[in-house]
From Swiss-Prot:
Pathway named in the protein's UniProt entry: Carbohydrate degradation; glycolysis; pyruvate from D-glyceraldehyde 3-phosphate: step 2/5
Recorded family membership: Belongs to the phosphoglycerate kinase family.
Localisation: Cytoplasm
Key word ATP-binding present: yes
Keywords: ATP-binding, Cytoplasm, Glycolysis, Kinase, Nucleotide-binding, Transferase
Protein name: Phosphoglycerate kinase
Organism of derivation: Halorubrum lacusprofundi (strain ATCC 49239 / DSM 5036 / JCM 8891 / ACAM 34)
Annotated binding of ATP, by residue: E332, G358, G359, D360, T361
Main location, first listed in the record: cytoplasm
Length: 407
């Protein structure tokens, strides 16, 4: 069991500051509904139904990226899931936010603006330093308690995650509670047969380090997505495409090149790379090319190819456990969902312990009608889930544990 207090311990009639993780895919400037809203709505609804005055914090994207937007649209989606109004204020801790907080009645819910629009939020720092920021020092006196429900961001040392538990009684929400217990159990479980990890997605930096750290737990890695392209480049293939209109791929390559080459050198026999990739052909249909036939860097490889999918299925079927972090392609486009869906279907039909992690991958399960019950656990966490596999500490969990019993 976790060593932190939960919302079961929250005093009645509290004004609570609740940290969620509503970070979502953005299409045409609008957030897309996903399981994070559904899961966090359970915590918000429970708090509001109990008569607490509920003020929510969350983030979306990072400054400078296309998905860095206001949370105004998130409030509408969350309200649909909670089943009651969720007011929104385009401010984090200024006068407008403080006035809206002060006016909040019992059972009412308010969402503050994107925490990453606050200068105090993003730079990673120790909790003691974050607790002294103007952001925390201004907001904290307005509340009786702090609730962290953002397990998927628990590996970050951001002000909204690690600062408030040092100055307020702190509790875990339902998502934090259930994800922590599930992922802790995963990290300590032993398996009799082969353990396979499917690695994809666009955020490769955290995963590459974990691949190195999981050397003694994972027997084979099946790669796709950006991580797969990074390893293909290390193997001498001219691949790698721009992400979200930026040079994020090249940034991840430069940041991780030495580690990638080291992992490939030491664990090359355990790492399966794509042998073909899919892209949009001249007629707009899905087209595929063998990796060995790629002779120059081309933007736009959007999925692993059919040969790769077929090659990934047997090791999955032979596994005692399969962990998934990230999608193998741009599954939001049906033309490039084959890799992600094919691997998930192979896992679902295998009698093994299986965990699917990451908000995008769990969204694929919903989009393509897969049965969540066919997997041992479906986590909305990405980076935190990966770190839990290695037993690495999660800063936001550590401060909750340190705050236990403080009321």
């Amino acid at each position: 069991m976790a060593a932190f207090d939960t919302i079961d311990d929250l005093p009645a009639d509290s004004r609570v500051l609740v940290r969620l993780d509503l970070n979502s895919p953005i299409e045409d400037g609008k957030p897309q509904d996903n399981r994070r809203f559904e899961r966090h709505a359970e915590t918000v609804r429970e708090l509001a139904d109990a008569g607490h005055r509920v003020v929510l914090m969350a983030h979306q994207g990072r400054p400078g990226r296309d998905d860095f937007t206001s949370l105004s649209g998130h409030a509408d989606i969350l309200a649909d899931h909670v089943g009651r109004d969720v007011a929104f204020v385009a401010d984090t801790f200024g006068d407008e936010a403080l006035d809206a907080i002060d006016a909040l009645g019992a059972g009412e819910v308010l969402l503050l603006e994107n925490t990453r629009m606050c200068d105090d939020e993003l730079p990673e720092a120790d909790p003691e330093e974050k607790a002294e920021t103007e952001f925390v020092q201004t907001l904290a006196p307005q509340f009786d308690a702090y609730v962290n429900d953002a397990y998927s961001a628990a590996h970050r040392k951001h002000a909204s995650l690690v600062g408030f538990p040092l100055v307020l009684p702190a509790y875990a929400g339902r998502v934090m509670e259930t994800e922590y217990e599930a992922n802790t159990a995963i990290a300590t479980r032993e398996f009799d047969g082969p353990v396979t990890m499917v690695v994809g997605g666009t955020k490769a930096t955290d995963v590459i380090g974990v691949m190195d750290a999981l050397d003694d737990r994972v027997d084979r890695f099946l790669l796709g997505g950006v991580a797969g392209e990074l390893f293909l480049r290390a193997a001498g293939h001219p691949v790698g495409h721009d992400l979200e209109g930026t040079d994020l791929f090249d940034e991840q390559w430069e940041e991780n090149r030495e580690l990638i080459e080291s992992v490939l050198d030491e664990r090359g026999d355990a790492i399966r790379l794509a042998t073909d990739l899919a892209y949009e052909g001249p007629d707009g249909d899905r087209a595929e090319v063998a990796v060995d036939d790629i002779d120059e860097k081309t933007d736009g490889y959007l999925d692993v190819g059919s040969e790769t999918i077929a090659a990934y299925e047997p090791p999955i079927h032979e596994s005692d456990a399969v962990f998934v972090k990230g999608a193998l392609g741009v599954f939001e486009d049906e033309r490039f969902a084959d890799g992600t869906v094919g691997v998930l279907e192979a896992i679902a039909e295998t009698d093994c312990f299986s965990v699917v992690g990451g908000g995008d991958t769990s969204r694929a399960i919903e989009m393509y009608g897969l049965d969540e019950d066919d997997f041992s656990h479906v986590s909305i966490a990405g980076g935190a889930y990966i770190r839990a596999l290695t037993g690495e500490p999660l800063p936001a969990v550590e401060v909750l544990e340190a705050a236990a019993g403080r009321q």
